[in-house]
């Protein structure tokens, strides 16, 4: 009678070793989930070892079962057959040195047998294999992203200078040399830009085609020198790569190549950094480590590896970045302080360049600490854990340090690769909507958003019909509660057409500085609020007319003259108020807003690339309606409104008892006016503009007279062989000549602004 013993555990990948007198040792792999039932058919002796944790093992009288260290060893005599039964159905014969057959029943499916090796997949293994196949497909479609690999079918960025240049070896030269290198680049760029706008620099006359060609050449030169200067300037170039409102399209096209097409640094250096940071050799830590990087960015590069059976990627930081940032940011602060003095622009916005610099410097220093990036990644993933269309790679904290970041390998296709997305079979229109919705969630709901959303940091795979994959969380933005509340209040003010509420919200956010007289600002806000709905209706009507015209086979867009006329009409209505705003400069531009505006400008460009009819306002409309419903139904909002109303009523009740005093004060003011003791100051904007222009002209004329006198004096001295004083006189003459040139430009700007304000431009 047979006796049996059993034990429960989970069955992993066992190895079966057959040793017999008739054949050498052969290793066969079996993956099952079930019951092992050996039968004793004596033919020759062999040993059977299953390296696994057994679910249940049964034995006959003549078979010994030993369970030790997750291994089951069965010794006995077999007549060429064994039977493995489980919770499924799979049967296959085994051909090999072991003469017999095996029946394998598992809760999966039998895949194959080769020379006595049988593989049975469980549901978990099958799911894992399918996921690997899916990832491999995404890799094959998006393989062009590894632009720096030697592939003749891919278009690579042409960089004539040595990528990495001296900044990769900056410890070998001094801070002074680096500073001279930076300012040499700045001076060259200013001179080249100035020269490209001068007629005498064009052979055969200046034409628009020649100017475009010159801008393309200069833009390529700018990109190559930014690459040569290194990570700090690459980051700045990335910031401007989407600002089509500042730079011509030729510059934007070249700077966009800085977004993720940055040359990698030597892999040997990356390998040494990984081993130093993780405290061991890559052979001991990883099952596999790919020597060649799969991507490179301004601050580091990415290598694939296999860790404990899982595919991972390692983000390795470029060496010596902090010392390089210390040098570069000192020079950039000088530039920011200069811009703080020469700005504001004529739009009335006085940008706080020093604050923007401080914010950027803080972000750069945070980006070179990968532990902070890992924390940002986990916070971001937690915010979107309930959304199926957003994926964030998981972090392996045990293998993450300030210079090495280890995370889950999640392949994807860049969101601006239209042909690859079509080949993947995802809905591009839906992807554009998802991108905007995800950012609205980040800003309005969480107040924590990805501040660098260029196409290199947003990818797509085919999960759930198209899923957004976010990478690189080193550059994140946070919106404080008062700014978020101010944004909502401004939105409600626009909806209710209440200029006072809009201005109050702008003051709360720090965008508007309350000056002594906000009358011009209020009138301008009221004008835009009143015309907002009319302009939206006109735009909708214009779109309908254009669509109808296209259906009939012709299109009649507005001519350039008609657009200019509409612009003149708008300026004529509020021109004086805009000029007063420009003079008072009540607006400020918080540093956080630069990242928000940049993010939505990037998303708008991405969306229009995915869908020609992309309209960001249509996507944001449901969120606006939801905010309005919350405004109407939210308990907290109702309580807040009641509190505000109570404060206003309390103030009104208090003022009721002060009316007599105010009437008395008004009578005193009128009496002083009648007696001539009170001066009334009236602001005449036309006179102010005229005086400013006259002052500029007078200064220019004075500089011209001084330059003329000095050039005569220097010439006389030189002719009389008095060379040293002549040289000094020529130098001072050059200074006054430069002042004359600046004065002429300033007078021209005054004239242009006058024409723009009066609508005669």
Curated annotation (Swiss-Prot):
Tell me where it mainly resides. Answer: plastid
Query: According to the record, what happens upon gene knockout?
Result: Increased sensitivity toward oxidative stress (e.g. hydrogen peroxide H(2)O(2)), high light and cadmium ions Cd(2+). Higher superoxide dismutase activities in chloroplast and disturbed expression of genes involved in the antioxidant pathway. Pale green plants. The pale green double mutant atsia1 atosa1 accumulates ferritin and superoxides, exhibits an increased nonphotochemical quenching (NPQ), and have a reduced tolerance to reactive oxygen species (ROS).
Compartments (UniProt record): Plastid, Chloroplast envelope; Plastid, Chloroplast membrane
Origin superkingdom: Eukaryota
Limits of the Protein kinase domain: 288-648
GO CC list: chloroplast; chloroplast envelope; chloroplast membrane; plastid
Residues recorded as binding ATP, renumbered to this chain, are 294-302, 315
Q: How does it sit in the membrane?
A: Single-pass membrane protein
Q: EC number(s) for this protein? A: 2.7.11.1
Q: Residue range of the transit peptide?
A: 1-57
Do you know what upregulates this one? Answer: By cadmium ions Cd(2+). Progressively repressed in senescent leaves. Levels follow a circadian rhythm, with lower levels during the night. Down-regulated in response to iron deprivation.
List, in alphabetical order, the Gene Ontology terms for molecular function in this entry. Answer: ATP binding; protein serine kinase activity; protein serine/threonine kinase activity
In this protein, the active site sits at 452
Q: Which UniProt keywords apply?
A: ATP-binding, Cadmium resistance, Chloroplast, Kinase, Lipid metabolism, Membrane, Nucleotide-binding, Plastid, Stress response, Transferase, Transit peptide, Transmembrane, Transmembrane helix
For the protein in the UniProt heading, the enzyme class is transferase
Q: What does this protein do?
A: Involved in resistance to oxidative stress (e.g. hydrogen peroxide H(2)O(2)), high light and heavy metals (e.g. cadmium ions Cd(2+)). Influences responses to reactive oxygen species (ROS) production. Together with SIA1, regulates iron distribution within the chloroplast and mediates the oxidative stress response. Together with ABC1K7, influences chloroplast lipid synthesis/accumulation and modulates chloroplast membrane composition in response to stress.
Annotated protein name in UniProt: Protein ACTIVITY OF BC1 COMPLEX KINASE 8, chloroplastic
> What's the source species' lineage?
Eukaryota, Viridiplantae, Streptophyta, Embryophyta, Tracheophyta
Gene that this polypeptide is encoded by: ABC1K8
């Amino acid at each position: 009678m047979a006796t049996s013993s059993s034990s429960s555990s989970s069955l992993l990948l066992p190895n079966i070793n057959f040793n017999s007198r008739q054949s050498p040792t052969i290793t066969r792999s079996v993956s099952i989930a079930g019951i092992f039932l050996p039968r004793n058919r004596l033919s020759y002796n062999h040993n059977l070892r299953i390296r696994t944790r057994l679910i249940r093992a049964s034995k006959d009288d003549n078979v010994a079962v030993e369970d030790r260290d997750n291994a089951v060893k069965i010794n006995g005599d077999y007549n060429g057959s064994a039977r493995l039964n489980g919770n499924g159905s799979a049967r296959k014969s085994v051909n090999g040195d072991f003469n017999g057959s095996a029946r394998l029943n598992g809760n999966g499916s039998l895949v194959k047998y080769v020379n006595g090796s049988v593989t049975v997949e469980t549901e978990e293994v099958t799911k894992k294999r399918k996921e690997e196949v899916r990832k491999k497909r995404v890799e094959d479609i998006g393989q062009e992203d590894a632009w720096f690999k030697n592939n003749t079918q891919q278009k690579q960025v042409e960089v004539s200078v040595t990528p990495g240049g001296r900044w990769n070896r900056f410890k070998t030269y001094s801070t002074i040399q680096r500073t001279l290198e930076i300012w040499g680049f700045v001076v060259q760029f200013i001179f080249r830009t100035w020269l490209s706008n001068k007629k005498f620099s064009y052979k055969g006359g200046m034409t628009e085609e020649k100017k475009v060609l010159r801008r393309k050449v200069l833009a390529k030169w700018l990109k190559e020198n930014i690459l040569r200067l290194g990570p700090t300037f690459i980051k700045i170039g990335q910031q401007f790569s989407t600002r089509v409102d500042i730079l011509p399209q030729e510059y934007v096209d070249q700077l966009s190549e800085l977004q993720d097409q940055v040359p990698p640094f030597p892999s040997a250096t990356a390998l040494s950094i990984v081993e130093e940071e993780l405290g061991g050799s890559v052979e001991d830590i990883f099952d596999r480590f790919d020597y060649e990087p799969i991507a490179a960015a301004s601050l580091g590069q990415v290598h694939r590896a296999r860790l404990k059976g899982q595919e991972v990627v390692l983000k390795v930081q470029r060496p010596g970045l902090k010392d390089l940032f210390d040098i570069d940011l000192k020079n950039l602060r000088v530039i920011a302080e200069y811009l703080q003095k020469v700005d504001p622009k004529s739009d009335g916005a006085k940008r706080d360049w020093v604050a923007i610099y401080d914010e950027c410097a803080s972000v750069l220093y945070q980006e070179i600490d990968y532990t902070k990036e890992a924390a940002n990644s986990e916070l971001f993933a937690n915010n979107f854990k309930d959304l199926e269309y957003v994926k964030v790679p998981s972090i392996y904290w045990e293998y993450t340090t300030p210079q090495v970041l280890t995370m889950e390998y999640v392949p994807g296709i860049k969101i601006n690769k239209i042909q690859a997305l079509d080949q993947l079979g995802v809905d591009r229109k839906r992807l554009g909507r998802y991108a905007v919705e995800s950012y609205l969630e980040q800003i309005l709901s969480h107040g924590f958003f990805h501040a660098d959303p260029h196409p290199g940091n947003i990818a797509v795979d085919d999960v759930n019909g198209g899923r957004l994959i976010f990478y690189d969380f080193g550059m994140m933005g946070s919106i404080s509660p008062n700014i978020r509340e101010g944004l909502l209040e401004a939105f409600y003010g626009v909806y209710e057409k209440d200029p006072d509420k809009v201005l109050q919200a702008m003051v709360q956010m720090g965008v508007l500085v309350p000056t002594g007289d906000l009358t011009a600002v209020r009138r301008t806000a009221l004008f835009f609020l009143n015309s907002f709905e009319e302009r939206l209706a006109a735009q909708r009507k214009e779109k309908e007319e254009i669509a109808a015209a296209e259906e009939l086979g012709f299109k009649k867009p507005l001519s350039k003259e008609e657009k200019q006329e509409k612009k003149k009409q708008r300026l004529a209505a509020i021109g004086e108020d805009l000029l007063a705003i420009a003079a008072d400069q009540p607006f400020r531009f918080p540093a956080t807003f630069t990242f928000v505006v940049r993010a939505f400008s990037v998303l708008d460009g991405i969306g229009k690339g995915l869908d020609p009819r992309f309209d960001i306002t249509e996507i944001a409309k449901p969120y606006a309606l939801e905010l309005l419903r919350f405004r109407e139904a939210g308990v907290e909002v109702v309580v807040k409104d009641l509190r505000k109303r109570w404060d206003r009523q309390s103030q009104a009740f208090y003022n009721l008892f002060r009316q007599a005093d105010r009437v008395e004060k008004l009578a005193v003011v009128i009496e002083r006016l009648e007696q001539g003791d009170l001066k009334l100051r009236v602001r005449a904007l036309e006179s102010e503009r005229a005086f400013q222009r006259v002052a500029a002209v007078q200064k220019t004329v004075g500089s011209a007279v001084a330059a003329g006198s000095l050039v005569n004096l220097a010439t006389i001295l030189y002719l009389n062989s008095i060379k040293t004083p002549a040289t000094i006189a020529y130098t001072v003459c050059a200074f006054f000549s430069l002042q004359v040139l600046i004065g002429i430009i300033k007078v021209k700007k005054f004239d242009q602004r006058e024409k723009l304000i009066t609508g005669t431009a």
